[in-house]
């Protein structure tokens, strides 16, 4: 990464990775406050109530499909070139949503946004494994999660306010990627192919890949994706049902959950000194379930916002564990593919989320959709609890 004695480049690399990682967070949710206005603009389109949600989730589908391929490219050809290309495509595809008056064309541009985000998300996760190990990796993952969500707060609130001007306005925020690109060009170097400070190059040995353990992580990441994306896709409409249709308030509501995640994530590295990954997952999924249950009960703003804050705090205790555990399990030569699999699991959850939640909302209500999400989260928490009982003592890594 840089000379260990030169702290400035090290800090610059960390800041660059944090800023680049935040692009994945804003890929879908940045335009969520403008969804009701977009739906009204295209009200003549059949089933626009579903199609409007796809504005957010089509990127997730293409991320889910292409993230493993991005991981293969990373393992085969390296990290840096794919990251640079992903950022350029991200800016072009993101702003493209503002240039069309066709829902089909907008969805196509969102597909390319998903392709670019798959490259960015997988590459950044792999680079973290290349550059960090042990406690420093835990701390950086916590900071990355916090940075992503603090950035998400800024992007979401900004998106909510500019959406009051025009539903197209939030799409221009994607151009922030072009401001990050010079930092990537200057500070991100290609890691050596045969040496990984945070990994295991194998030394010529064939290292077994623990696919069962990796599968558990992928499953938890998928459920995380399903429930997480109910916030940007359904909260604006839930607020409307409660009589608060202002897109700015929608942005603040989604940002409240994101801010709660960010604050919790700041303490992740400190908490992990004393608590194992499975305990963090049990607590995080359980707290998120309580948050969703409160949201399902909400008939006024205070309880809804309490639920958003609790859910966000649970996510702040959960998200970093996926990447950290996979980086511990993945040999260096397949690290990109393993991290691509995680991105794929999360993004497939994002894509499934509106299909599941909107179907439930149509047949019953949004309240029932959030109760269903709470049940999914509680199930995962209990599954990790049972695994901990069976596998005592918990391994702390």
Would you name each region that the model predicts?
Residues 143-189:
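Helix-loop-helix hairpin linking two adjacent transmembrane segments in secondary transporters
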Residues 109-148:
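Cytoplasmic helix-loop-helix junction between adjacent transmembrane helices
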Residues 54-70, 255-267:
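Central cavity-lining transmembrane alpha-helices of secondary-active solute carriers
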Residues 66-78, 264-276, 361:
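Helix-to-loop junctions at the C-terminal end of transmembrane segments
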Residues 65-101:
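Conserved MFS/SLC helix-loop-helix module at the cytosolic interface between two early adjacent transmembrane helices
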Residues 35-64:
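Extracellular/periplasmic helix-loop-helix junction of adjacent transmembrane segments
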Residues 213-255:
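Extracytoplasmic gate region of multi-pass secondary transporters
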Residues 78, 99-104, 133, 297-299:
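Helix-breaking motifs and short loop linkers at transmembrane-helix boundaries and internal kinks
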């Amino acid at each position: 990464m840089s000379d260990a004695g030169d702290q400035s480049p090290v800090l610059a690399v960390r800041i660059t990775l944090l800023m680049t990682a935040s692009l994945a967070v804003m890929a879908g949710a940045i335009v969520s406050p403008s969804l009701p206005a977009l739906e009204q603009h295209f009200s003549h389109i059949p089933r626009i109530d579903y199609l409007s949600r796809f504005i957010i989730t089509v990127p997730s589908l293409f991320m889910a499909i292409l993230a493993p391929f991005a991981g293969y490219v990373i393992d085969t050809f390296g990290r840096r070139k794919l990251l640079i290309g992903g950022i350029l495509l991200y800016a072009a595809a993101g702003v493209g949503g503002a240039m069309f008056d066709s829902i089909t064309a907008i969805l196509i541009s969102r597909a390319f946004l998903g392709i670019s985000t798959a490259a960015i998300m997988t590459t950044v996760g792999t680079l973290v494994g290349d550059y960090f190990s042990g406690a420093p990796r835990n701390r950086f993952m916590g900071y990355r999660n916090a940075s992503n969500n603090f950035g998400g707060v800024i992007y979401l609130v900004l998106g909510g306010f500019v959406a009051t001007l025009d539903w197209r306005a939030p799409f221009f925020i994607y151009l922030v990627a072009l401001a990050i690109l010079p930092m990537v060009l200057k500070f991100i170097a290609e890691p050596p192919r045969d040496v990984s400070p945070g990994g295991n190059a194998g030394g010529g040995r064939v290292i077994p890949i623990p696919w069962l353990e990796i599968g558990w992580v992928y499953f938890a990441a998928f459920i995380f994706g399903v429930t997480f994306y109910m916030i940007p896709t359904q909260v604006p409409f839930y607020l409307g049902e409660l009589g608060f249709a202002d897109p700015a308030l929608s942005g603040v509501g989604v940002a409240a959950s994101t801010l709660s995640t960010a604050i919790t994530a700041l303490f992740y590295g400190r908490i992990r000194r004393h608590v194992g990954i499975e305990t963090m997952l049990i607590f995080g999924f359980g707290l998120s379930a309580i948050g969703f249950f409160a949201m399902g009960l909400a008939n006024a703003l205070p309880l809804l916002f309490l639920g958003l804050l609790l859910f966000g705090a649970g996510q702040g205790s959960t998200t970093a564990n996926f990447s950290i555990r996979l980086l511990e399990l993945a040999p260096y030569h397949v690290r990109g593919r393993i991290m691509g699999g995680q991105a794929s699991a999360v993004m497939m959850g994002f894509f499934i989320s509106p299909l599941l939640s909107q179907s439930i909302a149509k047949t019953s209500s949004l309240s029932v959709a959030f109760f269903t999400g709470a049940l999914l989260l509680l199930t995962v928490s209990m599954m990790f609890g049972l695994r901990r009982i069976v596998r005592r003592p918990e391994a702390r890594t």
